[in-house]
Amino acid sequence: MITTSVRVSRPGFQRWAARAGVAGPVLFTAGFLVQEAVRREDYSRVADPISALEADPRGWIQQVNFLVFAVLLTIFAIGLHRGIATTRYGWAGPALLGVAAVGLILAAVFPLREDPAGEPYDPGHHVIAGVTFFSCSALALVVLSCRFAADPRWRGLARYVGIAGILGLGCFVVLGRFAMPGGAPLHEVAGLLQRMTLLVVTFPALVAIALRLRRLACRPSALTRS
């Protein structure tokens, strides 16, 4: 018989962490959608990445959007770690979410800028932010799926989260290899592919995990045997 211990934590903090896990993707999405609506004439949702919003004179708004998401994702990662049964190397999934949050901070600290022709460009280091966020968020889902599989309370989400993580890694490769670089075959639809990665793959998985954490936070911690 295998005994799996569930970390005893403050349910109040876990509830707040779960709210942060839902609010992060939702507020971030609302933030860039509103900015896109304002910049309707000189911004393309299909071609331009979300980070191109930083190149605008009002780019500080998107920088703040990145930072707020980073804070909420970090809080969520901490609460999530405390809400899943402890396993060997189980810390890796939440830690990868934390690294993804660092990628968001880098995106704010090293924003895209506009050249004289009005085109956004990376003056340096912003590409590291994108690589960090998209790779680590996808890897986090894959690793978390393994930890979920070891916890009966989370097992029902394991397959979905694992598939989302694998799809996220595939999207990361497509974006980095075939869409984001100038002259790449899918460069003209890079913005669309980036948004699909977030809104169809990564964000729904994060919200599903956060909602499960919120539900479990209302239950008393216990020792689960399987």
Residue ranges and their predicted role:
Residues 2, 8-218:
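Hydrophobic, aromatic-enriched alpha-helical segments typical of multi-pass transmembrane helices
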Residues 218-226:
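Short, highly charged, low-complexity non-transmembrane loops/tails of multi-pass membrane proteins
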Residues 4-5, 225:
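N-terminal compositionally biased, intrinsically disordered segments and leader/signal-like regions
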